[in-house]
Amino acid sequence: MLSFSQNRSHSLEQSLKEGYSQMADLNLSLANEAFPIECEACDCNETYLSSNSTNE
């Protein structure tokens, strides 16, 4: 009986992990659809930061 309980618990845990993984993938794909344009401000900020570090 104990092994059945452990097996069921493991199976449930595996199902939850797969479900969370699928939800994360879905969230990423929805975010990519919602914001397809790359952030220009972020790119400018990276350029600014990298140019500052080379000047020092």
UniProtKB/Swiss-Prot annotation:
Signal peptide coordinates: none
Induction line: By heat shock and by exposure to sub-MIC concentrations of several antimicrobial agents such as doxycycline, erythromycin and penicillin.
Keyword Ion transport: no
GO biological process: regulation of DNA-templated transcription
Key words of the record: Toxin-antitoxin system
Annotated S-S bridges: none
Domain of life: Bacteria
Assembly behavior: Forms a complex with cognate toxin MazF which inhibits the endoribonuclease activity of MazF.
Known role: Antitoxin component of a type II toxin-antitoxin (TA) system. Labile antitoxin that binds to cognate MazF toxin and counteracts its endoribonuclease activity.
Family membership noted in the UniProt record: Belongs to the MazE/EndoAI family.
Protein name: Antitoxin MazE
Annotated organism of origin: Staphylococcus aureus (strain Newman)
Gene (name only): mazE
